[in-house]
Amino acid sequence: MTGHKPQSTEETPQMANPLDFVTPTEFVELPSKGRYPTGHPLCGQDTIEIRYMTAKDEDVLTNRSLLKKGLAIERLLTNLIKKNSIDASSLYIGDRNAILIYARASAYGNIYKTKVTCPGCTEVSKHGFDLNEHNVYHGDDIEDTGITTNGGITFTTTLPLSTIEAEIRPLIGTDEISMSKKNKNIKNMTSLVTDQMRYFVVSFNGYTDKKTINLVIDNMTAMDSKHLRNTFKVISPDLQIKDNFECPACGHEEEMTVPFGADFFW
């Protein structure tokens, strides 16, 4: 009787697939320097790891359904962020802008050529922006401004005319998405200033209910409104690309800021 030959317990070595590779990543510095509430995945983190853009990401940017809904950039950000625990919509707008700039530069180069409408004569011309020449603001330059910080998450200022104490915060992705959807449904764009305030105001004299906040905003003097908007800029971390634009048609010169939308990548 022939004995049964035992099978080897060693696995047959697998040949490496030459097409197996990991999408490269890079670390992007956060303008906010991780000034997020306790418990947020980026709280105290100076950087965020993102993936390089792929052909699938390009599909997202050309998806008509997503573009129509204004969700193309949101889907792209979600795909780029490596850690699934980080919700792109919870990031400060300045941090989101930083991710978009680095992703675009690594995918298509640092020179971004786009159409610019001259503020002087409305002539449309091409202008190139260098994405490496960006301005980073951490949103923490509040010394001698009369602004007080509440743990770096919200900030308080006193309106000069009404003396109302206003508590405000930087905007996040959720706010940006909501404002974008609302603006698409509004033909009259004259309320953009007050609409933005409704998002970044946390309270007036300690009152946090929307009814009180809307009442104060709708009746706010121009002086108080300007002060509140300027304070909002001071406390908001951001990364912007600005360049001096000279119109080839009329010679008008002005500093222009690059807008961030789906067409930023084309």
Please state what every model-predicted region is.
Residues 1-266:
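Long C-terminal interaction/binding lobes of large macromolecular proteins
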